[in-house]
């Protein structure tokens, strides 16, 4: 079934207007069954180069009785053909929740949060050339790895985990995945505390500096944005969320680098809280270094709220896109875009339908395949109730 919606411009900086445009089309292209095909995808899909071939993971499901998750492949050039390429086990790790990352050597790297030798998950590699799965590193005293960033030039894989070896507030780690498989080069770079924030959710490497957002705690209890050298030294607080609640609380989604002729910006999103809205913010990295400003505020009943996985940069460099996990007309979330090179206008493009068949509770973000065609995952709903992969085409 295909679903249609008209575009609504909801808010941007100080601009508020409503209008319509030709209809945008959304449809579920895969219904997870809860068994062999997997269940509950909680992360984004990635595209291998510009091939139209996508890979993703499900947290649960698979052909084992313990519902340990799978790696799957979707070929958008062959009528969205779906294939499971790996079934997780107690030995190979289980319950992957972070998005895969693509390496120049035609490998995918990912992480699991449970199972493996010590029960705390692992880092793994799936080779796209020979289809071999290898465990790279098994966590022994760090738990719940939840985001990864690969620097292809150095071969260093960076990541965050909810629990660090010395604290329960989380950590940042790195491992060399280019020169040794399995790797013995694992290193914890930084352990969070109450003041620096807890539960780091995403990180990015820009100009030899790591930027990491944390979901809670910090000076005002609502999360932080932290900057540090790529070796974990010289950690500095960029911003403590909650001081100005209009800027949002609880930053959660991935950080996106946007550059123009004069300035580099990091764009991020906040989930919001009871007395604090979901927002889009940006931080200047060159001119006006580390100055944070509000880009847009979400309205739950119109444009949606809780953009779980943040933004993606579009083929069109002036635009970023994302999905919300709540709100909108049907309270199942929305698909939106924001103008990152102009007035910051925030536009709702699609409401997730109310009938559950499309899928809902979007914890993963989007991938743009071609121009104006987007694929994403929903954690719940669909024909069997275990989530979907959906496609949205905008006009």
Residue ranges of predicted features:
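Positively charged n-region of N-terminal signal peptides that target proteins for export
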Residues: 1-4
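Bacterial N-terminal signal peptides
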Residues: 8-15
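Extracellular beta-propeller repeat domains
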Residues: 18-395
């Amino acid at each position: 079934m295909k679903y249609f919606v008209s575009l609504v411009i909801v808010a941007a900086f100080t601009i508020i207007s409503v209008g319509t445009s030709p209809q945008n089309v959304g449809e579920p292209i895969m219904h997870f069954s809860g068994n062999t095909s997997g269940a509950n995808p909680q992360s984004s899909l990635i595209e291998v180069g510009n091939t139209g071939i996508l890979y993703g993971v499900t947290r649960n499901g698979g052909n084992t009785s313990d519902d340990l998750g799978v790696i799957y492949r979707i070929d958008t050039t062959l009528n969205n053909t779906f294939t499971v390429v790996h079934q997780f086990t107690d030995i190979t790790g289980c319950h992957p929740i972070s998005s895969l990352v693509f390496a120049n050597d035609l490998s995918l790297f990912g992480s699991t949060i449970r199972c493996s030798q010590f029960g705390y998950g692992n880092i793994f590699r799936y080779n796209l050339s020979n289809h071999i799965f290898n465990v790279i590193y098994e966590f022994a005293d760090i738990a719940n790895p939840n985001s990864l960033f690969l620097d292809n030039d150095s071969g260093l894989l960076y990541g965050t985990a909810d629990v660090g070896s010395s604290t329960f507030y989380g950590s940042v780690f790195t491992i060399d995945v280019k020169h040794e498989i399995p790797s013995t080069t694992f290193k914890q770079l930084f352990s969070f505390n109450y003041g620096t924030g807890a539960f780091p959710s995403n990180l990015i490497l820009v100009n030899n500096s790591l930027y990491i957002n944390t979901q809670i705690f910090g000076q005002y209890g609502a999360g932080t944005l932290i900057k540090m050298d790529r070796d974990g030294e010289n950690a500095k607080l960029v911003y403590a969320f909650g001081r100005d609640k209009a800027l949002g609380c609880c930053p959660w989604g991935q950080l996106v680098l946007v550059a123009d002729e004069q300035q580099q910006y990091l764009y991020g999103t906040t989930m919001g809280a009871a007395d604090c809205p979901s927002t889009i913010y940006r931080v200047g990295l060159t001119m006006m270094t580390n100055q944070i400003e509000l880009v847009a505020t979400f309205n739950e009943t119109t444009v949606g709220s809780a953009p779980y996985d943040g933004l993606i940069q579009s083929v069109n460099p002036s635009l970023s896109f994302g999905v919300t996990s709540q709100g909108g007309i049907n309270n199942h979330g929305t698909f939106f875009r924001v103008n990152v090179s102009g007035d910051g206008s925030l536009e709702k493009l699609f409401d997730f339908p109310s009938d559950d068949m499309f899928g809902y509770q979007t914890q993963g973000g989007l991938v743009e395949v071609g121009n104006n065609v987007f694929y994403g995952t929903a954690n719940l709903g669909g024909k069997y109730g275990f989530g979907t992969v959906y496609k949205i085409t905008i006009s």
